[in-house]
UniProtKB/Swiss-Prot annotation:
Molecular function per GO: ATP binding; ATP-dependent protein folding chaperone; unfolded protein binding
Pfam family, one: HSP70
Function: Acts as a chaperone.
Protein name per its UniProtKB record: Chaperone protein DnaK
Lineage: Bacteria, Bacillati, Bacillota, Bacilli, Lactobacillales
The organism of origin for this protein: Leuconostoc citreum (strain KM20)
Record-linked Gene3D superfamilies: 1.20.1270.10, 3.30.420.40, Actin, Chain A, domain 4, Substrate Binding Domain Of DNAk, Chain A, domain 1
SUPFAM superfamilies membership: Actin-like ATPase domain (SSF53067), Heat shock protein 70kD (HSP70), C-terminal subdomain (SSF100934), Heat shock protein 70kD (HSP70), peptide-binding domain (SSF100920)
Keyword line: ATP-binding, Chaperone, Nucleotide-binding, Phosphoprotein, Stress response
UniProt xrefs under InterPro entries: ATPase_NBD, Chaperone_DnaK, Heat_shock_70_CS, HSP70_C_sf, HSP70_peptide-bd_sf, Hsp_70_fam
Amino acid sequence: MSKIIGIDLGTTNSAVAVLEGGEPKIITNPDGGRTTPSVVSFKNGESQVGDVAKRQAITNPDTIISIKSHMGEAGYKVTADGKDYTPQEISAMILQYIKGYAEDYLGEKVEKAVITVPAYFNDAQRQATKDAGKIAGLEVERIINEPTAAALAYGLDKLDKDEKILVYDLGGGTFDVSILELGDGVFEVLSTNGDTHLGGDDFDNKIIDYLAAQFKADNGIDLKDDKLALQRLKDAAESAKKTLSSANEAQIDLPFIASGDQGPLHLQTSLSRAKFNELTADLIKKAEQPVLNALKDAGLSFSDIDEVILNGGSTRIPAVQESVKKLTGKEPNHSINPDEAVALGAAVQGGVITGDVKDVVLLDVTPLSLGIETMGGVFTKLIDRNTTIPTSKSQVFSTAADNQPAVDIHVLQGERSMAADNKTLGRFQLSDIPAAKRGVPQIEVTFDIDRNGIVSVSAKDLGTQKEQKITIQAAGGLSEEEIEQMMNDAKANEEADAKKKEAVDTRNEADQLIFSTEATLEEAGDKLSDDDKKATQEALEALKKAKEDAAAEDADLTDLKAKTEALAKAAQELAMKLYQQAAPKEGAEGEAKPKG
């Protein structure tokens, strides 16, 4: 069975790992990084992903960051380089880039992946993630929750231990808490909670707001109104936040950030860790309640927890670590790299699927309750949150009026009592119900949740056995046709990118050959006759002309390749002549003189 890679598709950064020799290993990107910025930029019809995209974020307005925070959002699109893109398409570009460098590392095609999502992602967000994988040309074998993946990475070498662990996962854009029980190779999620709109970006924004307010008070100019200045502020805020994880003060120096009546203005200030803690105190406080909720749902107290695992880059913030320690009464475990653990755990799950990892069983849960709208707009739950998945649950309902010919099934996800306060996953109708008094027809509604947390719902008239089924596709979700089209577009871009790379390689090869041949001719000097050098010189000039003719981006490179090949052959013959010309001389110098 081919390798299944594990991908942590993050808000700020992404990572990929693979199982080698029974151990998960991070695959580095072409820049040598162990994580890749989840950034996509567009320019002149071309897209770039990762570090190169992030580096131009300041100067290129068509740069997209933190797209994960919009996954599953109905109707959401971003416009870049004159074209609209869904979050699934942008995420697919990141996945395609990751897939590409994973293939380069493995030396084989990668077609399957385990992709992680925040534990508190709803059905629409999970489906959007799966669609992104499909667009990128990946068969998504499993969607698993990020804290669960981190627990797999932590517990792989502790299969003989019985532990209850709390995973505190604060990433770039999302926050999750999961409580798991580990024992005899079984990783059982007892509960999960979180906030899909709380993460490192929010900490950055607190610094941005503070710096912008300070600058406005001093100079009367709002830097947030200037896109370029705002991007510079964002970069400075992120850098300051990272500095304050290990230092008590961060210097912020942004020259020529704006222009005033007296000329250019500069932002030069410092930010202390104490001030940063003050600015972000409400965010850290906000993260406490999900921890308490998860503990309550698991039926445990803090004294029952054996280990507290920190995951996600934002857990490097000292105030976050201090808050976790104070709340749980335990020193957090730092044995796993918070930036890499999720990808490593996803690779372990990939190994479980292929059979390369034995004796590991993962039992995950659904993060939110599922049900339907019933009379009076009430939300009737069929599956409670924190139910182990996969699972199935049925309940019989009836009609609300006499001779009702059809029932509308309104599928919801959430914890509120009234349907209107919960998240709509989808709607469908069961029709042709025989005329009868209200309450007589028996309509059985069944919910199925698969291992990926994807929901299917069916409704059956028990009298006629007529049945209607849907796999939930939330508003704003993609149809199969749209996914197919996006897959074709992605493939076309992949082929176009490959052609561009081939063109660059061809031109580089020609350049290198011209340079090395000129050096060889110079070295030959008077050692060879003009006749000996003639063929090489002619081939050299021919290649130079072919290179000029093929300078246009869309030029046909056939002639350039042929002339490169011709010069390579001529240069080889020239080198051979040089070698032969030098050989007898070296032999003569090396001969021993007879004794006289």
